[in-house]
């Protein structure tokens, strides 16, 4: 029996592992290595923060222990003083010194209170330091988020600049028709390249700033730890000083008491009577106070008794509702527990799982049957997991309340039979043939009460195999939560893979766009060179060489052509110089020919 108790939970665990293997077979083998490294880095950072937090908590616990030890010493000192008072009651001749001892005790109490106030102040300061450390950690996260936001804005700016560069390419294409604006377009392209360079420098500066802030936060954390250490040492020093002061005062008072007790005996009797009378009044006041407090406690106990009765009645009503004949109430409760497990798994409702999704299944006679599983959990590659909640509480509750072994065995058999009946009913629904739903080979039958689930598996070794043969996976809250978290992890990996593909696609498009821009820019350069060559040829025809247009036009003006404007002097002089040079070269050539 003990072996079965061990093997059945192990079988449930093996079933969970088997399902996980069915889900993850052939997928994500390469991606898990990178994910595990990333998670390890995150876990290392979390461990570092948790270690720092644990160290601070342990130091606070040590300080609290020292403070309690100080209170115990104070209490022990009070006990010693009480013993001294009893001794004074038996020795009237020592009453005078008793008064001084009481005065000393009062002073010690005042000092103890002062130390307690100081300890509270130190504890408050420690709490503030701890809060400051938490605020610094939160500030670090905010700074990192802000830096990531700035980097994303920088990337967006770079993309905008790249789009602007593409526009520049179009402008250069239009520049072939507008040669007069070529130089302005080239300056604009240079300005955009400088802007791109400045953005890259800004991104590098943000990265350096991030490293500086991380270093600053680490330094502040070390400073906080040093402050905590100094506060602990100060508290220990104060505790030692208080103990030494108490011992010194007690020794001094004891010595003075031995020297002066006989001389002041006659001054003690009257104050002693007054103190005894005051003590009686104090006892009376204490008794009255205890009576009032006892009455208050009695009223509070009556109120608690009423609340207990109310809770008992409400618990009984809930038990009756869940174990009665109202199966709808049990079903609603089971669905509520199932949805709670889904919310804690990390899956998002409406996207990664759907509640009460209606579907249709075709029957063998050609008709259709409408089915509505409790939950459909979506998987990558358009697959789904069907989860149906089944509540078996009536027999289980009677089993827990059984007064003898025979009744317990009978109710246990009824409990297992109830689960088996739910399993057979679920297998008849055959959720695997639903239209529009690509389910796995298994349907999850969820039992919301973990002890009831484990009790059935422990006492019926064939129940799990019988469910498995009918393609039903019997799960409780713990096993279902582990499976759903595995599904959530699969979705995260799928999202990362989709993001990686999108990044690769965008990178390819960006590279193609960059190649096109380079080709366009080369064409623009060739056009600029060609335009420059054409410009030089046209300018030579205009103002250089023999018979140029400027020289001919200037001759017409000199011959008396009326004109309201004149050509620029330097252009005319250049035309004359080139004309004279051309003529001299022609004469030289003729002389050589002669």
UniProtKB/Swiss-Prot annotation:
Pfam families from the UniProt entry: RmuC
Keyword Coiled coil: yes
InterPro entries on file: DNA_recombination_RmuC
Gene Ontology biological-process annotations: DNA recombination
The keyword Magnesium belongs to this UniProt entry's keyword annotation: no
Keyword tags: Coiled coil, DNA recombination
Coiled coil: 66-330
Record function comment: Involved in DNA recombination.
Family that this chain belongs to: Belongs to the RmuC family.
Protein's UniProt name: DNA recombination protein RmuC homolog
Biological source species: Neisseria meningitidis serogroup B (strain ATCC BAA-335 / MC58)
Taxonomic placement: Bacteria, Pseudomonadati, Pseudomonadota, Betaproteobacteria, Neisseriales
